[in-house]
A protein has these predicted regions:
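Non-catalytic terminal/interface segments that mediate subunit docking, oligomerization
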Residues: 75-111, 116-122, 126, 151, ...
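Hydrophobic face of amphipathic alpha-helices that form TPR/SEL1-like repeat modules
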Residues: 29, 34-109, 435
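Residue-level signal for inorganic ion chemistry
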Residues: 106, 142, 164, 186, ...
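Conserved C-terminal structural/oligomerization subdomain of aldehyde/semialdehyde dehydrogenase
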Residues: 19-20, 38-44, 104-110, 129, ...
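ALDH superfamily catalytic-core signature
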Residues: 19, 265, 270, 292, ...
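Rossmann-like NAD(P) dinucleotide-binding subdomain of oxidoreductase/dehydrogenase enzymes
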Residues: 165, 193-348, 475, 541
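Glycine-rich loop-to-alpha-helix module at the N-terminal edge of alpha/beta enzyme cores
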Residues: 100, 104-197
Length: 563
């Protein structure tokens, strides 16, 4: 069905409003679809307080064997073809593309459909039609789907871990942390939905009954990244549908397999067809169709700055038949810095920078891309950082002993190596790495790279590299270090290592990032512990994993009745 042929239907939000306004049995009744109070003794009301899922340490031999078996099982399914899922129906596209193991670029893990613009439109229209019924489902019931999905995810945990080891090149612990974060999002957002569903407090006045409650938006397009392909995908998607919206989910073409595993979980818990629709393919071929469709109400995106800004621009253009201002929730990366003060534990600082710079090959928006070191300890810190980096094992991460795996694809590898070349041409001093790893195998492996004597305005001091490269910048003193830290267009994460309370407090006031860490690394945010999102070109400061996050997928409605 073309855009011009779309059924008029009820506009987004109207179905729920109709339900609210035509089912009143009293002045404060009739909003069961979003804010019905759970029945006493129901499963949702008996939920324990939220607690983060613990990551495996894989010291137990039985657990290691189970993980190796899970990896073998995923490898045994390599080459399988997967369909689009639209309205619960499995649909073919216009040909297929493969998702590959970056540790072994000859291994095709799965074949995925290339969705066409027409299929993208069909997915939006299906989600739009489903919204009328899904938006009427009580909040408690919607939250229960998240809790059930979390339980299935726990049961399939090693399978999900193994998929990310093979598809994204995560080491075992990084992969398991990704799965744990996905479980955390499900458990936390389910509880948050129950909280938002309760009556909201208002000031009372004589002669009126007043209420304020939240209703969903409509159809959302969810575009997650490949680097946290389960955690961020699950967080973005579950937040959108637990609030009563329907979703078109378009995973990255570098991580469709783990996204498809999540769809299997949603099918297993019997989430109604059409609530989440799964389309794969090139963002260039279907992205504009999804974002620009007049029935798209919001876009939730995590990815690069340039793609994010393109989404913001397209979403701002009103399409024929569009009756709302589209909402965009965007996280777009960072150029994150760790400041190393003259008065600090340099051994701890070197370990923290190594982990934050090179964990998951530096392919985190929160990664330490810059180490800004006060002059007095600059040379000593460099010596310690190089020594720490020399301990890193590089190789295929299906083997537990390898800590640093491959970068995601050839395009990423070429880009990272180009940045390393530019860094040296602009005056940087190569201290470690700087080239592909010769011993690692048939994958996209780059040695962990340290470039010293970088200037703040150098290319590698400003641009996000998204690879295992740490630019080290010398600062005259602590004040200069904070100035340098703020001297980029980004503002996502940052850290300060210092023994001086006054300097930590200065950083608290002046280091302009959404997530600031003191005397620890700048990576590793936990749900409901470190609400995550950044300033400036890092995005809309959406604070995933926070008690504000679900509001981004809701709109408030006030109703007053004279009595």
């Amino acid at each position: 069905m073309s855009e011009a042929q779309e059924p008029l239907g009820l506009e987004a939000g109207a179905a729920l409003e109709y339900h609210c306004l035509t089912n009143h049995t009293g002045a404060r009744r009739g909003r069961a679809a979003l804010s019905e109070t759970p029945k006493k003794g129901s499963m949702s009301t008996m939920k324990q307080p939220f607690k983060n899922e613990a990551v495996y340490d894989f010291k137990d031999e039985k657990l290691r064997k189970d993980m190796r078996d899970a990896i073998a099982k995923v490898e045994a399914e390599a080459g399988k073809e997967y369909d689009l899922i639209i309205g619960g129906e499995h649909v073919k596209g216009d040909g297929t593309f493969g998702t590959r193991n970056p540790s072994n670029k000859d291994q095709v893990l799965g074949l995925f459909q290339k969705a066409t613009p027409d299929l993208a439109r069909k997915a939006i229209e299906t989600a739009d039609a489903t919204f009328e019924s899904w938006s009427r489902v009580p909040a408690e019931e919607r939250a229960e789907y998240l809790f059930k999905a979390a339980e299935v995810m726990r049961r399939r945990r090693l399978e999900l871990d193994a998929t990310m080891v093979l598809e994204e090149g995560k080491n075992w612990v990084e992969a398991d942390a990704d799965t744990c974060e996905a479980i955390d999002f499900l458990e936390f957002y389910g509880r948050e939905m129950l909280r938002y569903a309760q009556p909201q407090p208002l000031t009372e006045i004589p002669g009126e009954q007043n209420e304020y409650f939240y209703i969903p938006l409509g159809v959302g397009v969810v575009i997650p990244p490949w680097n946290f392909p389960l955690a961020i995908l699950v967080g973005m998607t579950s937040a959108a549908f637990v609030t009563g919206n329907t979703v078109v989910l378009k995973p990255s073409s570098d991580s469709p397999l783990i996204g498809r595993k999540f769809m299997e979980i949603l099918e297993e818990i019997k989430l109604p067809a059409g609530v989440v629709n799964f389309v794969t393919g090139s963002g260039g071929s279907i992205g504009n169709t999804l974002v620009g469709h007049p029935r798209t109400r919001f876009i939730s995106f995590t990815g690069s700055r340039d793609v994010g800004l393109g989404i913001v621009e397209l979403a701002a253009k009103t399409q024929p038949g569009q009756i709302w201002i589209k909402r965009v929730v965007a996280e777009m990366g960072g150029k994150d810095a760790m400041v190393i003060d003259a008065d600090c534990d340099l051994d701890m600082a070197a370990k923290a920078v190594k982990t934050a710079a090179f964990g998951f090959q530096g392919q985190k928006c929160s990664a330490c891309s810059r180490a800004i070191v006060v002059d007095d300890v600059y040379d000593e810190f460099l010596e310690k950082l190089v020594k720490e980096t020399e301990t890193i094992t590089v190789g295929p991460v299906k083997e537990q002993e390898n800590w640093l795996g491959p970068v995601i694809n050839q395009r990423a590898m070429d880009s990272i190596l180009k940045y390393i070349e530019i860094g040296q041409k602009e005056g940087g001093r190569l201290l470690h790495g700087g080239k592909p790893s010769e011993a690692a195998g048939n994958g996209f492996f780059i040695e962990p790279t340290i470039i010293a004597d970088v200037k703040s305005r150098d290319t590698i001091g400003q641009e996000e590299i998204f690879g295992p490269v740490c630019a080290v910048i010398k600062a005259q003193d602590f004040d200069d270090a904070i100035r340098i830290a703020n001297d980029t267009e980004y503002g996502l994460t940052g850290a300060v290592i210092s023994d001086k309370r006054d300097r930590l407090e200065k950083a608290r006031r002046e280091f302009h990032v959404g997530n600031l860490y003191l005397n620890r690394k700048c990576t590793g945010a936990l749900v409901d512990v470190h609400p995550f999102g950044g300033f400036n070109m890092s995005g809309t400061d959406s604070k995933a994993g926070s008690r504000d996050y679900l509001l981004l997928f809701l709109q408030g409605k006030s109703v007053s009745e004279k009595v």
